[in-house]
């Protein structure tokens, strides 16, 4: 098969799904999570980022995808695999002020806590002026979900830093 970049704005995502997958969103979502599970198995990294950005991209097809049980089951299976391998999950805040969402969506924060997954908060470095976008809100949401600390890179290693 060919590589199709789906980390795009929703309108371009729709065009790519229509062109390369005949508009079959369900197949794209299942293939996406299948490949993410394979990535987790192969490893070679510390952090898993943009853990459920698919819900945003796919919103151009089905705005309620995040609420569909089959989608939720895929995301939970993915997080369970992440927990088994001991990776850190990035809580990405870049789009919080524009779109009102984190990646992963905050509805999964309690599940991450339940699984014992460590989390790390960042906003990407694509836009330096957005480096702290949504950080305070993400930390507050994590605290509400039961987290007391987040992972941060200091002096060449991951350390837990208390959420104040």
Where are the regions a protein language model picked out?
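Extended substrate/RNA-proximal surfaces in nucleic-acid metabolism proteins
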Residues: 1-85
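Charged catalytic cores and adjacent phosphate/nucleic-acid-binding surfaces used
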Residues: 5-6, 61-164
């Amino acid at each position: 098969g060919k590589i199709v970049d789906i980390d795009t704005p929703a309108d371009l995502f729709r065009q790519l799904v229509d062109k390369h997958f005949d508009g079959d969103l369900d197949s794209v979502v299942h293939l996406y999570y299948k490949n993410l599970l394979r990535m987790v198995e192969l490893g070679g990294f510390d952090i898993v980022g943009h853990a459920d950005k698919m819900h945003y991209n796919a919103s151009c097809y089905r705005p309620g995808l995040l609420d569909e049980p089959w989608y939720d089951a895929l995301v939970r299976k993915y997080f369970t695999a992440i927990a088994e391998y001991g990776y850190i999950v990035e809580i990405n805040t870049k789009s919080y002020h524009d779109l009102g969402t984190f990646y992963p969506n905050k509805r999964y924060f309690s599940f991450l806590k339940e699984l014992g997954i460590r989390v790390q908060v960042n906003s990407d470095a694509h836009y330096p002026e957005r480096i702290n976008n949504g950080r305070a809100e993400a930390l507050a949401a994590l605290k509400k979900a039961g987290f007391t600390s987040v992972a941060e890179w200091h002096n060449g290693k991951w350390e837990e830093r208390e959420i104040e």
